[in-house]
Amino acid sequence: MAKKYFGTDGVRGEVGQFPITPDFVLKLGYAAGQVLVQHDTDQKPTVLIGKDTRISGYMLEAALVAGFTAAGVNVVQTGPLPTPGVAYLTRALRLSAGVMISASHNTYSDNGIKFFAEGGVKLSDEVELEIEAKIDEEMKTQPSARLGRARRISGADDRYIEFCKSTFPGHSDLRGLKLVIDTANGAGYGVAPKVFHELGAQVVSIGNEPNGYNINEKCGATHTKTLQAAVLQNEADYGIALDGDGDRLMMVDKNRQVYDGDSLIYVIAKARAREGINIGGVVGTVMTNMAMEIALKEQGVDFCRAKVGDRYVLEQLNQRGWLIGGEASGHILCMDKHNTGDGIISALQVLAALQILNQDLATVCADWQPYPQTMINVRIQKGQKWQEASKDVLAEVEKELEGKGRVVLRASGTEPVVRVMVEARQADWARDGAERIAAAIGGI
């Protein structure tokens, strides 16, 4: 059954436009509260709510609190806290569910609602459908004796900081390192610099002055130029960039070289292999560069691909019992450290890996160079049989690139576009293959 309101990462959109309106979010909180009450019959459920620094967070938090308490659910509020911090505290405090108010790397004019189940894991499709079924029902507030309470929780930041630090090797520290930390004027501004400082690093903080409107604005993991300049200006060893809700990571070295999620995953996996730790393998996505796959296999590390999205990477990790996964966008999962993507913890794992390998980022990542990619968006008509039109040329290109490149065709879920991606050992092979396939699709 198709979902009506939930996307791949909760409910998200432009503030003031459906579904990110106070009245809908009130109903969403009430519907989720009803489902919790039905599932937790022994005692009154308690939900933890965190948020990033968007101005709309105040409005949406109030609406959620009203909905949950009307359904008979207690609420604890953390204030600004990274998404993985909400997941951790939901598990650590043994709460019924967690909710994060954020639109991740989007601009301040967007926002969203993301749910975590008991244990800090993402909601199943079945539970999301249960919630959706109740959203359109009439709200019937619980009798006064059964209404929920709401309160602010103290020490949430400190609990999460200590958890992050606990994932770094206990026999080591970060003394001698100078780091620039860019928190994207987002949810990590109050916690990320403290984590690295308390582990001994000299920390320079940027993107740490949120005003409600500047989240992700020319800063953070989606805009690394600011970090590159700051690393150079401060003569730092590395720069660490998070996104608005703190679950993505990009890094920069002293030469201003940017390292994406693929490169950082490789560093972590290589160090684990060097230590003899059995990680099972690495899960990437259909967009992960083929050169990384080959480099991992040369280290004796298995590799598989999931659909694009950290949700699908997580599914594959759980199914296979593997420990490391992620995507180039900076979502990195280290399942032996946390059960969700965490930018701070991922950065700590990279820094620990560099100590284990006794090399810098540039040296480790010199093991492989990304294959050149050509991407072409082909606009099509509704109902156009593009698969049939392109199958012969697709087969030809795939045969030519066997063992030295690959092809990915993806139909957009939001617009009438087919995305053609070809990567190959040589740039002209990739360009030629992509152009031939795009021409065969036809387009308009």
From Swiss-Prot:
Cofactor note: Binds 1 Mg(2+) ion per subunit.
The keyword Magnesium is annotated on this UniProt entry: yes
Binding-site residues, Mg(2+): 104, 243, 245, 247
SUPFAM superfamilies found in the cross-reference section: Phosphoglucomutase, C-terminal domain (SSF55957), Phosphoglucomutase, first 3 domains (SSF53738)
Residues found modified as Phosphoserine: 104
Tagged with keyword Magnesium: yes
Gene Ontology BP terms: carbohydrate metabolic process; peptidoglycan biosynthetic process; UDP-N-acetylglucosamine biosynthetic process
GO cellular component: cytosol
Source species of the chain: Neisseria gonorrhoeae (strain ATCC 700825 / FA 1090)
Catalyzed reaction equations: alpha-D-glucosamine 1-phosphate = D-glucosamine 6-phosphate
Name of the protein described by the UniProt record: Phosphoglucosamine mutase
Modification after translation (UniProt): Activated by phosphorylation.
